UniProtKB/Swiss-Prot annotation:
It comes from Actinobacillus pleuropneumoniae serotype 5b (strain L20). Keywords: Ribonucleoprotein, Ribosomal protein, RNA-binding, rRNA-binding. One of its GO terms (molecular function) is rRNA binding. Residues 21-31 have a biased composition (Gly residues). SUPFAM superfamilies: Ribosomal proteins L15p and L18e. This is Large ribosomal subunit protein uL15. One of its GO terms (biological process) is translation.
Length: 144
């Protein structure tokens, strides 16, 4: 098999419409665009959301919500991510070194998701009640 011999399966592609090639083609003269009007012209058409001058739906509805800038620097990790760290001490730096979180993350919270078999010491990370119970049940501990 060579790249120059590859071709799509038979019937997988439709041939393009050949417009403006005479009456007999069925797509001559106006080429399927109808008569006159903005949509018949070259480059004609209206932008997305345009409703002919009527106030468009996206402007009739109220604004709501916002994106917290904090969300770009805070991460949630699962219990099974703790096992990816070398050694038994889990800190912000050790999570970055193990590529569990990206370098720009400033704080982390451990949530109750996944399983943990390894006893680990969690230092300086946020931990939910359920995650704390699971870590302590596995023989680990949490330090502030």
């Amino acid at each position: 098999m060579r790249l120059n011999s590859l071709s799509p399966a038979e019937g997988a592609k439709h041939s393009a419409k050949r417009l403006g090639r005479g009456i007999g083609s069925g797509l001559g003269k106006t080429g399927g665009r109808g008569h006159k009007g903005q949509k018949s012209r070259t480059g004609g058409g209206v932008r997305r959301g345009f409703e002919g001058g009527q106030m468009p739906l996206y402007r009739r509805l109220p604004k709501f919500g916002f994106t917290s800038l904090k969300s770009f620097h805070v991460a949630e990790i699962r219990l099974n991510d703790l096992a990816k760290v070398d050694g038994n001490e889990v800190t912000l730096e050790s999570l970055k070194a193990a590529n569990v979180i990206t370098k720009d993350i400033l704080s982390v919270k451990v949530i109750l998701a996944g399983k943990i078999e390894k006893a680990v010491v969690v230092k300086g990370l946020g931990v939910t009640k359920g995650a704390k119970a699971a870590i302590e049940a596995a023989g680990g501990s949490i330090e502030e």
